[in-house]
């Protein structure tokens, strides 16, 4: 068993980095600690120009860089110095004049940045595939018992602190080793993804006509949290987040108070937050079992999120119990007070939490309070995954949005301006309701949500039942459907309860019958040409 506390002194370091963030300060600290520094190319020049004593690798090996820099560190005096086992390989190292290298600070050619540039061609991409860097990283990681490998600038300070304490412990070197293998795995995965999208049948191997989906799919996620259990108590679970942070989301949120997030908390909070992001004006979304059970939008001058919460809650007070509440504005103290005095809530999430709100919610220590930060108006593209037995379904994120200008009026009666506002609102909500999804809305408030039924007309019936149970007036409300109506019965049912306007994708073989049903009832109907199935 390796002693976790034994400290490894550093006498010689090799530094060769593409990302030079913090490297000058790090090298100066090493120099002050008496560490001999070997370096290459641009890194050597940077150190030398700034007064840091370093030996160029070419001078140390006696072998100049060649092939336009393709071969720099691939030499026995480098890799023997890194891979040599102290106490085992000392004699052979001495015989060949190989000095031990105790620390390697390396990061790799910016392959991702290169291929992200417009017009990047395959030869350019290939020249930015690092060979010597990953080789040194893997060598040092393999021999982490005797060598420290540093691939992240964020680790420089910790390494210096350890050296000042007498050296790096095995536990520190093990952690650095793990980061190194994670780093090279992500790098190789990125290259494989890129190369796997190129059409090899084309002589030019142009990068302009690449497939959207690589031959093998490589993506890296980092464990953020181990959970007590999964969706059910007999299942184990953990929460992994993307290695590269994106827009504000459940994965970037900071928990300010409350019990540890559960598997279901994370899934439901994601659904609530992604839904509330759809709205520009102040909005509140309440979610239960990944379905919105209440949503409302209220302009600032009409009450903002405080009023929006009241309206969202009024949609379905029973389902809101133990739900998740998301806002697209800073949570203020007054709104927080209304929540904790009115209902039991699992999670509250907002881009920002005011100090007053924190103090109010602090009285309910079990409530999980999350601050996720602001998000851009334009949603970022990305991938969605669905695991099936033995496989993985991968698709682009559903970031499709519509505005009033995109609507196609298909009935004799055109919707009024207020109906259009409500139709667009209901459509945004329907996108986040499990299919078959039906949403009734009025004055930018949901008044009934029918979710997850095998029959679309049954979802419509449930939405009407929900509205009646909540004491909300359906007469004059609008209806949104996430997919087309295969038969006229959905419209006939809507007419019976007083729906005045309908929004749906269109595209059914029986669109003409459905439109006729709407005309017979005096219902205005618009097509979006876009479906929002959610399974």
UniProtKB/Swiss-Prot annotation:
Chain ranges of the MGS-like domain: 6-151
Reaction catalyzed: (6R)-10-formyltetrahydrofolate + 5-amino-1-(5-phospho-beta-D-ribosyl)imidazole-4-carboxamide = 5-formamido-1-(5-phospho-D-ribosyl)imidazole-4-carboxamide + (6S)-5,6,7,8-tetrahydrofolate; IMP + H2O = 5-formamido-1-(5-phospho-D-ribosyl)imidazole-4-carboxamide
Entry keywords, A to Z: Hydrolase, Multifunctional enzyme, Purine biosynthesis, Transferase
Pathway: Purine metabolism; IMP biosynthesis via de novo pathway; 5-formamido-1-(5-phospho-D-ribosyl)imidazole-4-carboxamide from 5-amino-1-(5-phospho-D-ribosyl)imidazole-4-carboxamide (10-formyl THF route): step 1/1; Purine metabolism; IMP biosynthesis via de novo pathway; IMP from 5-formamido-1-(5-phospho-D-ribosyl)imidazole-4-carboxamide: step 1/1
The organism of origin for this protein: Pseudomonas entomophila (strain L48)
Name used for this protein in its record: Bifunctional purine biosynthesis protein PurH
Lineage, highest ranks first: Bacteria, Pseudomonadati, Pseudomonadota, Gammaproteobacteria, Pseudomonadales
EC number: 2.1.2.3, 3.5.4.10
Name of encoding gene: purH
Any one GO CC term of the record: cytosol
Record PROSITE patterns: MGS (PS51855)
InterPro entries reported in the protein's UniProt record: AICAR_Tfase_dup_dom_sf, Cytidine_deaminase-like, MGS-like_dom, MGS-like_dom_sf, PurH-like
Record-linked PANTHER family: BIFUNCTIONAL PURINE BIOSYNTHESIS PROTEIN ATIC (PTHR11692:SF0), BIFUNCTIONAL PURINE BIOSYNTHESIS PROTEIN PURH (PTHR11692)
């Amino acid at each position: 068993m390796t002693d976790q506390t034994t400290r490894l002194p550093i006498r010689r370091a090799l530094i060769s980095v593409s990302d030079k963030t913090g490297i000058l300060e790090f090298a100066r600290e090493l120099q002050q600690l008496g560490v001999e520094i070997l370096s290459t190319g641009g890194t050597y020049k940077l150190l030398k120009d700034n007064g840091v004593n370093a030996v160029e690798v070419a001078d140390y090996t006696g072998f100049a860089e060649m092939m336009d820099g393709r071969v720099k560190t691939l030499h026995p005096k480098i890799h023997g110095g890194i891979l040599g086992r102290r106490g085992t390989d000392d004699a052979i190292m001495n015989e060949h004049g190989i000095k031990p290298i105790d620390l390697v600070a390396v990061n790799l050619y910016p392959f991702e940045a290169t291929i992200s540039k417009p017009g990047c061609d395959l030869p350019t991409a290939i020249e930015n595939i690092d060979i010597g860097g990953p080789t040194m990283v893997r060598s040092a990681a393999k021999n982490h018992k005797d060598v420290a490998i540093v691939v992240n600038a964020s680790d420089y300070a910790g390494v210096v602190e350890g050296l000042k304490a007498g050296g790096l412990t095995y536990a520190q070197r093990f952690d650095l080793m793990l980061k190194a293998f994670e780093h090279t795995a992500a790098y190789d995965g990125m290259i494989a993804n890129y190369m796997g999208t190129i059409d090899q049948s084309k002589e030019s191997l142009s990068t302009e006509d690449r497939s959207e989906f690589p031959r093998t799919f490589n993506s890296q996620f980092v464990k953020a949290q181990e959970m007590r259990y999964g969706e059910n108590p007999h299942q184990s679970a953990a929460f992994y987040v993307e290695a590269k942070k994106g827009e504000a989301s459940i994965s970037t949120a900071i928990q300010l108070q409350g019990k540890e997030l559960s598997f279901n908390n994370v899934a439901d909070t994601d659904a609530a937050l992604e839904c509330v992001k759809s709205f520009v004006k102040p909005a509140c979304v309440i979610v239960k079992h990944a379905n919105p059970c209440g949503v409302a939008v209220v302009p600032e001058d009409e009450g903002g999120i405080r009023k929006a919460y009241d309206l969202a809650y009024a949609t379905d007070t029973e389902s809101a119990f133990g739900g998740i509440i998301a806002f697209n504005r800073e949570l203020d103290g007054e709104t927080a007070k209304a929540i904790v005095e009115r209902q039991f809530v699992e999670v509250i999430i907002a881009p920002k939490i005011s100090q007053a709100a924190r103090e109010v919610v602090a009285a309910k220590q079990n409530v999980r309070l999350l601050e996720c930060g602001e998000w851009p108006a334009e949603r970022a593209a990305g991938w969605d995954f669905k695991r099936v037995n033995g496989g993985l379904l991968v698709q682009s994120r559903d970031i499709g949005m519509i505005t009033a200008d995109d609507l196609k009026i298909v009935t004799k009666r055109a919707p009024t301006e207020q109906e259009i506002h409500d139709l667009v609102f209901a459509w945004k909500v329907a996108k986040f309701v499990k299919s078959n999804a039906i949403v009734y809305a009025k004055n930018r408030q949901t008044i009934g949500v029918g979710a997850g039924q095998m029959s679309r007309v049954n979802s419509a019936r449930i939405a009407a039942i929900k509205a009646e149970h909540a004491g909300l007036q359906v007469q004059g409300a609008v209806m949104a459907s996430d997919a087309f109506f295969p038969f006229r019965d959905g419209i006939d049912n809507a007419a019976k309860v007083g729906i005045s306007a309908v929004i749906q994708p269109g595209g059914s073989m029986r669109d003409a019958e459905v439109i006729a049903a709407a005309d017979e009832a005096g219902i205005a109907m618009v097509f979006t040409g876009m479906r929002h199935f959610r399974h």
